[in-house]
Amino acid sequence: MGKGVGRDKYEPAAVSEHGDKKKAKKERDMDELKKEVSMDDHKLSLDELHRKYGTDLNRGLTTARAAEILARDGPNALTPPPTTPEWVKFCRQLFGGFSMLLWIGAVLCFLAYGIQAATEEEPQNDNLYLGVVLSAVVIITGCFSYYQEAKSSKIMESFKNMVPQQALVIRNGEKMSINAEEVVVGDLVEVKGGDRIPADLRIISANGCKVDNSSLTGESEPQTRSPDFTNENPLETRNIAFFSTNCVEGTARGIVVYTGDRTVMGRIATLASGLEGGQTPIAAEIEHFIHIITGVAVFLGVSFFILSLILEYTWLEAVIFLIGIIVANVPEGLLATVTVCLTLTAKRMARKNCLVKNLEAVETLGSTSTICSDKTGTLTQNRMTVAHMWFDNQIHEADTTENQSGVSFDKTSATWLALSRIAGLCNRAVFQANQDNLPILKRAVAGDASESALLKCIEVCCGSVKEMRERYAKIVEIPFNSTNKYQLSIHKNANAGEPRHLLVMKGAPERILDRCSSILIHGKEQPLDEELKDAFQNAYLELGGLGERVLGFCHLMLPDEQFPEGFQFDTDDVNFPVDNLCFVGLISMIDPPRAAVPDAVGKCRSAGIKVIMVTGDHPITAKAIAKGVGIISEGNETVEDIAARLNIPVSQVNPRDARACVVHGSDLKDMTPEQLDDILKYHTEIVFARTSPQQKLIIVEGCQRQGAIVAVTGDGVNDSPALKKADIGVAMGIAGSDVSKQAADMILLDDNFASIVTGVEEGRLIFDNLKKSIAYTLTSNIPEITPFLIFIIANIPLPLGTVTILCIDLGTDMVPAISLAYEQAESDIMKRQPRNPQTDKLVNERLISMAYGQIGMIQALGGFFTYFVIMAENGFLPNHLLGIRVTWDDRWINDVEDSYGQQWTYEQRKIVEFTCHTAFFVSIVVVQWADLVICKTRRNSVFQQGMKNKILIFGLFEETALAAFLSYCPGMGVALRMYPLKPTWWFCAFPYSLLIFVYDEVRKLIIRRRPGGWVEKETYY
């Protein structure tokens, strides 16, 4: 058997080269896959096919030959995409991004403890505790995130059922049913209605065969398959049937030309699994944030390391300080906060039918600036529906709404009765059994999409079609074929006063009209004159221009003299009239838009998101749906529209004058990347029609070159490469193929485009709320670090210890920080432009300056005020504390004098110091009350926003209760070195808390009064 042209190109080569060679080869393979499908089998005659594959076109291959080929090519199955082992996924959660910062902190803590253990007789265990706690935080949060993602991938596992199981092949002249994996190139295969196509086939004979290619090309209409070579493009020609598409009716026989990964479907799957998904925007934001925090920590650490050497501390002490400052800068609780916030949003989205596969995708949808949407099933209902009829010389509109709440038309006309009778009788579609309790539009139908649409329409308008068919029993029929372009049947007519036989016919409108000499108007036959022919032509063009599929209908009462009862009608040697019939009307069908889509597209537009339609369907249909859902808005013209309006050739119109643009896949094939960039840049409303899977990918890459964050929706296998390449891929849960669900980051459980808009809203909200959570969490870093810094510089007893810092970060601050995730939007977040990933960061300099430089400093003052009050009440006035550290911390000195000359032992001094730690901790809780309330909003006043967030109010009480518990619970002095406080000491920080609230309210007032002013530029994060 000859080895087929173009075959070598797709052989998955053995991976032998290393390093760069391997990478270059991968890139070359990807470029190869992005090219259009190249095959020439559809152009070959049957003799050439026989020579190329060595197959007997009647007897098939011999069993021995088939076994040889199977050994050479391997099984006819898609290579499963390389899956990430579970332990790698787990490690990613443990060591990715933010976790790394905490691990470094933990290692530094153990290092500091090691240094202390080696140099001191009785080292303090603080650093050891801190190291252990940091490690525990990372491990627990890592397990939590891993569990979240594993849960989503479990749902994914349940989707696997893509590949056909059995195939009917002819070998040694006998038909045999074999496992589809054993089909080989050159096999002679038979398929019938209801089968999945087992491999790429070159059809050699067919009988009324139609296939559903929607999972591959996106066309909702079944495509005819026959042995004829009808198009240069292998995806468009009629004599190739593709692996894993469905045969919906008829039978066909074909020769296998490609199997497994070499099939068109296989190439798409390989293309999808070979694409690298980029970093998600939120991951980039967290990385940016880590850089900032690390920068601040290292800067402070090194500055004070040098300062402590200048102040004549020893090297080892200076290193301990350095480590202490760096660790104090790490916000221990933030990793858990971010994870919990994203999880809460993911749960909220799941309730609204968006299943998110990885947590980071939650926010990506919020920063989306371009959505490339598939048409069939996403924007539309994925069911052909009767949209218009033309009879009695006027166009009537049918009801296309999902719940039949739309307009109706006049059903009393005698012509409509005749038209509905033809549509019901000349129709092979039937409702499947046992569905009487379902609404008509929801019932499953056996038959092609157009006939199902007619069946449902007639059932809704005129009652039971089954009864109609019983009343007019079918005698003979000629099924639709591509040469005649019509379908005809003859029925018994039981109506009194009418001839006994009724001939009904439907088909391509122009072919039907050619066979008619009269037309039915208001139930009366009239001769078909030029005027009526023009009226027909205008109606046909108008309906076709709406992107609808139009069928013509005619009938003839067969005279009883020529066709008495029992007449033998012969369909092979036609013995009845098929000309001079009576034209009755036109019916047009379309896959109508979903009800919620126009509103969703409008919301996207006001949110600054560009919606681009990318479909495999015809440009006219695509444009009609785009106009119907608002992707091309009212009054916006394409180049063709302008040319038609000005009555000039298209070539004379300047493309930049047109806001809207419909691009045909064949034009896209010849475009340079620069030309595509031009289209994406200068047109606001774009439709790509007749695109191939590879082109979808090129469009997504083009949008990303413009700096857009791209979301792609799709349900077919053909969408999977684009889904994988996009910043966020959105697959359909009901109609989606498994390959597309595997490639996507998010799944719409109800297949509705409107759910994406909900997702965008949730994504934007979580971004805003994460900012607030981070601002809240970071603020307490300053009152945690400054005591340590003053301890080094001013040589005073340590005002706040390590253990108390942990109680704040992992205790009192956690619930309030998470409660901000429940905060409602301040303004209509769907009215603003998408954020610019380059300039609008999650954590920017302004947020750091607010948290560290302004609010944090006021908090630190509150803490120090409490510290000095308690020290003074115990006899140590502020001026006496300066420089006392060395003697204070010396366990052998038991006679340190205070300002009044009283002597203090080491134990007594330490109890006062730990009481100060507790009081400083409580002061931070008190000032964090105000911080939590001001973090609710970034621009509005808290009085405008209100205190509707119940979780936040719970958080305020929870942190206060926790602080009181840690302070007053017996035994805390031993466990955490925390001692009970006098009630008056709680109030020391109150004025500072009030100051924070007033300061921030005034700042926000100025921002609202002077938008774009100095205060907004410097402090609005």
Curated annotation (Swiss-Prot):
It is found in: Cell membrane; Basolateral cell membrane; Cell membrane, Sarcolemma; Cell projection, Axon. The gene is ATP1A1. The sodium/potassium-transporting ATPase is composed of a catalytic alpha subunit, an auxiliary non-catalytic beta subunit and an additional regulatory subunit. Interacts with regulatory subunit FXYD1. Interacts with regulatory subunit FXYD3. Interacts with SIK1. Interacts with SLC35G1 and STIM1. Interacts with CLN3; this interaction regulates the sodium/potassium-transporting ATPase complex localization at the plasma membrane. This is Sodium/potassium-transporting ATPase subunit alpha-1. ATP binds at K485. Pfam families: Cation_ATPase, Cation_ATPase_C, Cation_ATPase_N, E1-E2_ATPase. The chain crosses the membrane at residues 86-106, 130-150, 287-306, 319-336, 771-790, 801-821, 842-864, 917-936, 950-968, 984-1004. The modification Phosphoserine is found at S16, S38, S45, S226, S450, S482, S666, S941. It is an enzyme of class 7 (translocase). Its EC number is 7.2.2.13. PANTHER family: SODIUM/POTASSIUM-TRANSPORTING ATPASE SUBUNIT ALPHA, SODIUM_POTASSIUM-TRANSPORTING ATPASE SUBUNIT ALPHA-1.
